[in-house]
Amino acid sequence: YEEESSDRAFEEEVMIVGFGNAPVKPEGEGVSFDNANEGFTARYEHETVALAFALTEEAVEDNLYDRLGSRYTKALARSMANTKQIKAANVLNNAFSSSFPGGDGVSLINSSHPLSSGAVSANRAATFADLNETSIEDALIRISTQTDDRGLNIALQGVKLIVPPQLQFVADRLLSSPGRVGTSDNDINSVVNQGMLPEGYVVNHYLNDPDAYFFKTDVPDGFKYFVRSPMQTSLEGDFDSGNMRYKARERYSFGFSNWRCVDGSQGA
């Protein structure tokens, strides 16, 4: 994710539809003009994430605060960090669902992303396939031939493969072997040989679908993480009960602007 700070209740990013190819200007004639327009708007709704625990007045009185407090504080930090990982992964977990549309009105991974020209574009295969040599090559070809809304080739490249734990061994064989996997042919592994996924693969333990996998691309303004309020902690006593209460709180949002940031499959 690209991390950015925010000072508002939400953030909106308007995508720009650029210009077409520049035409030849005949001698003595005026230059041609083109119009750049605004595309769809991606919206990031910040969420407040907070959790607290309390120690009784008696526990504090019996000098248990130092022993229990430090352990509870570490557990609280783990809970906050785990929640953030889940929310970050949910952008991919919900990538195929129409219930979580992006700024263009369709799911993050879709076969019919609408373009300003009236055409549609896809960041998935027409038929989902399991992770294998062919599906990797097809995805990398699809990524490299993506165009912008005006039909200009933007020469995207895949950066890394993101897989759940269930696919880590398949991914390792496919991206670590110098030769083709599962064949007796003495052919090179073209993906490895050309360095087409420079960051290799990464295992995301928070992905829900054991068959789904994703290719992150190098398009700008893709996945974004907005920090509205960094992690803050506070400690106070409760007058009525005498308990000591410890709270952790932060505000942030995860999302995406340009859907070309990823290509993916749910598996066959």
Locate each region found by the language model.
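Sequence/fold signature of self-assembling virion shell proteins
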Residues: 109-149, 155-160, 166-268
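Flexible, active-site-adjacent loop/turn segments at secondary-structure boundaries
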Residues: 42-47, 58, 98, 106, ...
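Alpha-helical scaffold segments that mediate packing/assembly in large oligomeric complexes
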Residues: 66-71, 78-142
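Solvent-exposed, flexible loop/coil residues
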Residues: 5, 37, 48, 59, ...
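Solvent-exposed, non-transmembrane amphipathic alpha-helical segments
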Residues: 21, 73, 89-96, 100, ...
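Assembly/oligomerization interface modules of large self-assembling protein complexes
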Residues: 1-49
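Short alpha-helical interface patches
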Residues: 18-20, 29-34, 49, 55-64, ...
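Long, contiguous amphipathic alpha-helices that act as assembly "spine/axial" helices in icosahedral shell
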Residues: 41-99, 161, 246-248
